[in-house]
């Protein structure tokens, strides 16, 4: 692994920040590309010395020439593509969503083709699936049909299809990972970010209402980052999309964990009982057969780590109360 150099897009996002953190801690060189300038997620989980070891480049995945030049210039060997606009943003601006999420992904594969890089790990989504009633009861199997019901989900299906073409025509192996309900420090955007925001609110002594009820596959952000890194190092060959699984967890379980850790906040976290139109369980056995057992932080441990990190950022002044207010907005 000493000759590795990771190129990570979307590293100012939650999962990207955790990918960067893991790579820095193991001493692996990493170049990150992001169109945004905010580093508040990285500042939440990395100290200044650790951040200094990340090679930041401001850029747009929709610009193929720029992407290729950056990948070539840094000597990239391992690619983790996370840059994307999330579901609410794609709904608000489908044209921009397609440019970033589809064209941007094609550009990553094109750059890999031109530079003879033969492996990509990229973010897909459980949004590729249809509503719960479209599938039999139980965990959704690996080979279940895809019935996306949003622009965002359709873009992700397109990415998985294009990845398959790059495997068939150019021999580029790719693993598209479909996280479920990611939580943890830095998870402050997207449809399922409100459980993490509830943890931040508890740290600040503020009431908060989680925007959904029901049970879903909760996944701690650090675990998801580690799986992306492992996927980028696999010796498996082919192209496919894989669900990560996750621990089936209810919204009330999350609230109970928060209240257990911060008893004074009991009764201040509520939730909308309307469930999201997603299944709680996905069969990840095919992914496990390729990558081995996946990290799976227990809920209480993950919630505690999240609360501890946010409390520490307040105590050491790394993030101000104003910064955390922005997280809740």
PLM feature spans:
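N-terminal Rossmann NAD(P)H-binding glycine-rich loop of SDR-like oxidoreductase domains
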Residues: 6-26
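Conserved catalytic-site region of short-chain dehydrogenase/reductase
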Residues: 88, 123-136, 151-157, 182-185, ...
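NAD(P)-dependent short-chain dehydrogenase/reductase
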Residues: 12, 161-217, 221-229, 258
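Conserved Rossmann-fold NAD(P)-dependent oxidoreductase catalytic core, especially the SDR/UDP-sugar
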Residues: 106-151
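Conserved glycine-rich Rossmann-like NAD(P)H-binding loop of the short-chain dehydrogenase/reductase
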Residues: 28-39
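Conserved internal alpha-helix in NAD(P)-dependent oxidoreductase domains
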Residues: 77, 84, 95, 99-106, ...
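C-terminal substrate-binding subdomain of Rossmann-fold SDR/epimerase-dehydratase oxidoreductases
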Residues: 206, 211-214, 218-329
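NAD(P)H-binding glycine-rich loop region in Rossmannoid oxidoreductase-like domains
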Residues: 58-100
């Amino acid at each position: 692994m000493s000759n590795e150099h990771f190129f990570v897009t979307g590293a100012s996002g939650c999962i990207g920040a955790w990918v960067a953190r893991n790579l820095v801690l193991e001493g692996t060189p990493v170049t990150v590309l992001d169109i945004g300038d905010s580093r508040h997620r990285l500042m939440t989980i990395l100290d200044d010395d650790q951040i200094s070891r990340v090679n930041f480049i401001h850029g747009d995945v929709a610009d193929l020439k720029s992407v290729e030049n950056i990948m070539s210039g840094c000597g990239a060997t391992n690619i983790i593509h996370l840059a994307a606009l999330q579901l609410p943003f794609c709904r608000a601006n489908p044209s921009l969503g397609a440019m970033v999420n589809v064209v941007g992904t094609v550009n990553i594969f094109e750059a890999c083709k031109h530079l003879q890089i033969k492996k990509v790990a990229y973010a897909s989504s459980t949004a590729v699936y249809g509503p719960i009633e479209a599938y039999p009861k139980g965990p959704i199997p690996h080979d279940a049909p895809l019935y996306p019901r949003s622009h965002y989900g359709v873009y992700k299906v397109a990415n998985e299809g294009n990845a398959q073409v790059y495997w068939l025509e150019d021999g580029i192996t790719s693993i598209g990972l479909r996280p479920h309900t990611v939580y943890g420090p830095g998870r402050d955007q997207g449809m399922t970010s409100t459980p993490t925001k509830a943890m931040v609110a508890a740290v600040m002594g503020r009431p908060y209402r989680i925007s959904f009820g029901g049970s879903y596959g909760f996944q701690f952000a650090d675990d998801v980052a580690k799986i992306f890194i492992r996927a980028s190092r696999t010796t498996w060959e082919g192209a496919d999309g894989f669900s990560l699984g996750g621990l089936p967890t209810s919204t009330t379980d999350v609230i109970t964990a928060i209240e257990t850790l911060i008893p004074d906040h009991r009764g201040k976290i509520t939730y909308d009982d309307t469930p999201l139109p997603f299944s709680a369980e996905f069969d990840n056995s095919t992914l496990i057969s390729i990558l081995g057992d996946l990290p799976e932080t227990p809920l209480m441990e993950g919630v505690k780590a999240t609360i501890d990190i946010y409390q520490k950022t307040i105590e050491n002044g790394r993030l101000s109360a104003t910064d955390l207010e922005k997280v809740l907005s």
